[in-house]
Amino acid sequence: MAKKVKVLLTALAVSSALMASNAIAAKGTLGKVMKQGFVQCGVSTGLPGFSNPNSKGQWEGIDVEYCQALASAVLGDKSKVKYVPLTAKERFTALQSGEIDVLSRNTTWTLHRDTALGLNFVGVNYYDGQGFMVKKELGLKSATELDGASVCVQSGTTTELNLADYFRTKGMKYTPVVFDTAAQTSKGFDSGRCDALTTDQSGLYALRLNLKDPSSAQVLPEIISKEPLGPVVIQGDDQWFNVAKWTLNAMLNAEEFGVTSANVDKMKDSKDPNIRRLLGLDGPKGKGLGIRDDWGYQIIKQVGNYGESFERTVGKGSPLNIARGVNALWNAGGFMYAPPIR
C-alpha cells in the first residue's frame, strides 16, 4: 500500500510540475525576461570549466557564457544574468516551476528528459562521455578491472544509471557511494570513501583540479556512454525556444565564418552574405525571433564565438586544457554544426 501511495504522489508531483510549466509557457518567457531585465539562469553548484564561481565570486564556464550570450541577444548586455546554483535533483523542477528561464548546467539530452518532463533541449554545447577516475596507487589501467569496487557517483544523474548499466553488462559487481553534489562526490573520492569516481569525462578533469593532490589520480581510458550536454528551456514556449536555440547557432556560425569578438566590428564591412546576415545587417535580422536586429553582433561582441568560449573555459586557455576533439567544427573533424542564418 505504501508503495502505491508513493507512486501516486510521484505521479501527482510530475503532473503538477507539467501544469506549472504549461502556464509559464503560455505567458511567454521572452516577455518575462525583457520585463524583468535579466535572464534567470540555472547552473551547477560548482563545476570548473562549466559553471563555477571564481575567487571574486563571479560565475565562469562554458555554460555560464551561454547564458551571457542569451542575455546579450535579448537584452544587449551580457551582465544581465542572475545565476541560480542547482543540484542535479533540483534542476528540472526549477525550470518547470519558472524559478529559472533557462537551465545551462552540463545536462545530458535524453529521450525521457526531452519528452516526459515538459522540457526542450536547445542543442549541444559540449559532447561528452562518462568515464572513471581512480587513485594511481591502485595500479589500475582499465575500467574492466573495477569488479568489486566502490564507486562515488552523484545522485539524480544519467551517470548513476549508466554506472549500473555498465557493471551489469560487464558482469561485474560494485558498491555505489552516492552524493548530492559534484563537490561532495569529489571530496568523498579524495578522502578515500570509494575506489573510483565516475562522471562525464570533462567533469573528471575538472574535479581532479580540486583534489588535495591532483597528480595522485588518473582518468581511465574507457568512455562508457554518450553524453550530449546542452541548455534546456520549457516546452510549449516556441518563441523562447527559438531565441535560445539560435543563440547557440549564432556562436557556432560565427566560428565557422571566422567572426570573433576582436574582429566583429571590422566584419561589418564584409561582403560575405553569411556574415552580413549573422550580424543583422541583411536577411531576417531579429524579426522572426522577436528581438533586436543586431542580436548576433551583440553575442559575438560581448561573449565571442563558440571556439573562443570553448578555449577560454575548458580548452587551451583554461586549467582543464581539454582538446577540441569531437567538439571541433564539422569542417575541422568535429561534430559541431549549425543551420544557416538566412
Q: Language-model features: where?
A:
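Bilobed "Venus flytrap"/periplasmic-binding protein-like clamshell domains
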Residues: 40-49, 59-74, 108, 128-184
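Sec/Tat signal peptide C-region and signal peptidase I cleavage site
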Residues: 18-25
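Extracytoplasmic small-molecule ligand-binding "clamshell" domains
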Residues: 25-104, 291, 306, 329, ...
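Hydrophobic helical h-region of N-terminal Sec-dependent signal peptides
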Residues: 8-18
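Extended ligand-binding regions for polar small-molecule ligands
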Residues: 65-68, 72-74, 136-140, 144, ...
